[in-house]
Amino acid sequence: MAVVHCLGCGLVGAWVAKRLAALGHQVHAYDILPHRVMGIDGITVHQGDVLDNLMSMSNNGQVDIVVNMLPGDIGHMATTDLAESRYRVVDLSFSKHTPDRDNQKAQDYGASILWDVGIAPGLSNMLLAYADRAIGPLEKAEVWVGGNPTGPYGEWKYMAPFSPIDVIAEYTRPARVIRQGEEVVLPALTQRHMVDTGEHGEMEAFLTDGLRSVLKSIPAVEMSEFTVRWPGHIQKFIDERESGDLNEDELIFEWSYDHKIPEFTWMKVRAQSRNGKILEWEVEDHGGDDGHSMARATGMVTACCVEAWLKNPDMLPVGVHAPEVLGNHTISQIIRAMKLNNVRIDGPEISFE
């Protein structure tokens, strides 16, 4: 089994570290607050500033692969530093800066980086890329995704299943979309509309900046990503922002995750070809004994990418790679693993042709 170094032990990072340890890998976990992975068999904990430990990981033994699960800009700084290594890096971090700008540096140093390996972006990219290969060129591509309580609980009707800081950034960063075949920038939280989420009924969707790499890699006439929340949540955010009453420090507390409240993650990916053919997938998870739904849905994609790369060391060359470069076989493996772990995924089977 491999030696895997996991950076960041938040809700998602801890799930991935535990998952990889349960699969038999030797895991080194790094975090300033590593309490979620303390005392877990197969995990060696390194407490402290992760950025200070990046280039000394080899002092802790073999490094077969690095998994970056640090939040926001800290995660981006870690990936930028790791581009100056010879490591294989699976990068779940999310910030306004994307790792592809470090592609030349990674090639020069010999690093291989696979980025945006969550549910969306991540699995959403893979499904859109599969649709493009199967029925493309695409007329329209859309992603709806959200992790929410199962009902509109509390004043905000929301709790953050990952870093609240990243959620705030998601709500404020302008959304890059495709319109008439060209990339344009629209204000986040616009194009609000209702979407049917099945058993949870009608929820509200709005534009966010989650397309990232597919803006360049998948040609389409129109492409959008929407975040899904309970009605009333985003209007409250907008009202408090416009009145000047929005306090980000308070939001971090008010949106904190409460494991006693039932929650779910839901995603729909829809691709329409220029001749009218449609491929559509729906993903839903309600969590389990091993973690909450967003940690599971996101973490399974991350862990499966780690597993696939360990099994096939030549899966990716040096440089920086987006998830849509992964082949149909890897996508199928990820979907199969998620289904085996009771994540509902409805939609067309991934063909190997």
Label the model's feature ranges.
Residues 27-39:
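NAD(P)-binding Rossmann-fold cofactor-contacting core
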Residues 12:
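Hydrophobic/small residue at the entry helix of a nucleotide-binding pocket
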Residues 4-8:
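Conserved N-terminal Rossmann-fold NAD(P)-binding element of oxidoreductases
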Residues 17, 21, 83:
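Gly/Ala-rich phosphate-binding loop of Rossmann-like dinucleotide-binding domains
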Residues 134-353:
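C-terminal catalytic/substrate-binding lobe primarily of soluble NAD(P)-dependent oxidoreductases
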Residues 48-100:
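NAD(P)H-binding glycine-rich loop region in Rossmannoid oxidoreductase-like domains
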Residues 93-113:
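Rossmann-fold NAD(P)-binding glycine/threonine-rich loop
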